[in-house]
Regions:
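C-terminal binding/interaction regions
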Residues: 1-54, 59-76, 82-111
Length: 111
């Protein structure tokens, strides 16, 4: 297996994508947040003391995705063309599933 982010001496480098063709790319990441039934009820009803938890989390997720190239070493700066953050409340397992989908058209992708 060849590691593309290292040169022949093992030094880290940013991959050169200048010769690649632009393509449309899309990726979705999902994760689950587990909590007590009482907490889940408050989040669902919007009665948490801090306000709209999922609304704030959505905005924070969008902001974080826009800063990916600053947070992940050697990641190319991406021109995101669409970004969604969605939540699914699953009361039977006391969880909230978070899903973030990012789209771009470029020489490198969001995957």
């Amino acid at each position: 297996m060849e590691f593309t982010h290292f040169d022949e001496n093992g030094n880290a480098l940013m991959v050169d994508v200048s010769e690649k063709a632009e393509t449309k790319r899309e990726a979705t990441a999902r994760g689950s947040i587990y909590m007590s039934p009482e907490c889940l009820k408050k989040v669902k009803e919007g009665t948490m003391a801090k306000g709209d938890v999922l609304g704030v989390a959505r905005v924070a997720g969008i902001m974080g995705a826009k800063k990916t190239s600053e947070l992940i070493p050697l990641c190319h700066l991406l021109n995101l063309t669409k970004l969604t953050v969605d939540f699914t409340i699953k009361e039977e397992t006391n969880e909230i599933e978070a899903a973030c989908t990012a789209r771009t058209t470029g020489k490198t992708g969001v995957e």
